[in-house]
């Protein structure tokens, strides 16, 4: 048989002798099979593969990719039309080879193939990709059973797990599932599909099967051997989270639930009286009445006689209010009026094949379920959210959004079955609130708490949490793994109910657990205590002022944490990062079994104590030299393990040698007291050059990144044989140019002979008892270089 092939370049314009095409799409109509392979380069590091039957005429579902990725710069590629094989290569060396006869696809970098698509279109709802032996895989959304997902079957069907604990197999499937994984070799795969599916992560293959009504497409995301780069590229593809409201980086109190206005005001007053900083309070379902009133979505006047005054008073105290809503409108309570109003409008989900609202039964009653795929539903919810926001509600909490109860008999307005639409429900629900803020309050940064969704959820300013975890040591222990896998999946703000939510009636109170959990919360993206009872830190008086000191410490780290938020918004980097995040070429694997340590940004390592009764723990150190922040004279080398003393008041915490850690060392009642122009800059000495970039903007506007209304302040250290030279220089605008810094050098055991600032000697302020060197610096124009010399 004569070999026939067809290579179609979309809008082909070949550049003479160069092999470059202006458009980055290659289409191969296979010879021996009735399907067409289309390869599209979305960037120099990302390719999309579509394998479509030639006679397929179905409707394409929405893609998981964001508009920016789909409509961005068209990358330049080289396309070669071989006799047997057609090849596309991006400028970064990512190559896709298609066997013209049958459409077999190989994707790789350089001479190495990462993946081979061995079964194109044999079954349009199934994709099998062969990978190299010995790889580990991470991500896939909120997964708590293990950090390394290799050898597992990952089901993608969002599921609530009430009261879960470490080691339970149900933690393999949680509230936010994503059809994606990242390989330890530094590449990732995203299947462009939100329907119910499974991904078998085998020893040498990824087998993906879905209920989707369309052929499965997928993206291969190259990181050039580094997981860090894969995360950057993946979040560019599906969207990144914008800068958060600053108050979300403070302390938030929450409970199931504050039952009335008097109790809520009492909690706020007690926290303030006891000296706790406070930035938010979360109202569970009692704000609208009782459990059976779900879907009422208006303040209960009996329990909250003057909620408007309460909201005003809280605002004056710097306390933001977050209120809950759910997908259901029940008919066995006072939400019946809303049900009767909305049912004739087609707002609720229908039974498949009928025009009848499908009755959904949950744990407190029955009623209708909002069909958020319906424009009428979105319009009604948006109007209700707007009216409550106008009254003073600051943030929104979407609960039960898996959806927790989603009968299979439902057919959604968009034509999809419950199984097909289930995972996307949380994304579309979040977008209702996000769009409200973008269009009605464009200068306000939204705070949206959601516990369910799929890939790209973060682009709607979502602050997820790990749902109703058990208040137990077993519930505490998987939280690091959950934050790690979620963070690699784009969910940079994944957090947890600090203290544990689901109570054991036989042991409601465990002070040691609460303190250790609070220590983990100190270095979690959101510090929010939440439980069914005894949620607030002032209940644990047996530990004196330790709970207050932990929460106050959160505020001292605001400048560092806000810079992490900038890194997340600008690069997609999670706040919580695995120990091997900066390793390359499979070296991340050496740390994948360390499930109770993590990097907090690039320069800090956290090792929480997560075992009951423990007063010490083993600690493993990744690449670099690490300085004990608690005892800065102690240093540890890479790839070593030590046993570290950690009584209840000690959180093991380490800084990378050479790190600059900005801190706000003054008392705050809330983040409104934060002054980014008055900071301590902790420099942890190193014999190697180092640098750090501090982010500085007005702390509130939504356009500071896009409009360039911010400063990047760079700190650099250049050690020499006889001194350390430190330079400070900013660039940009939009914030005060004058800065009052205090450069702190902890762990400096020998008093320096002199210190100079911009060539002038300054008085030595050296305390040998800590030891620490303090250098006050007044900078009149941060965009001018300031030079500090510490002479040995």
Q: Each PLM stretch: what is its role?
A:
Residues 16-18, 561:
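N-terminal signal peptide c-region/cleavage motif recognized by signal peptidases
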Residues 8-16:
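Bacterial N-terminal signal peptides
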Residues 3, 20-247, 254-256, 260-269, ...:
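N-terminal accessory segment at the very beginning of proteins
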Residues 1-8:
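Bacterial N-terminal signal peptides that target proteins for export
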Residues 5, 618-625, 758-761:
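Short alpha-helical "patches" and their helix-cap loops
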Residues 113, 117-651, 655-656:
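Catalytic-domain carbohydrate-binding cleft regions of carbohydrate-active enzymes
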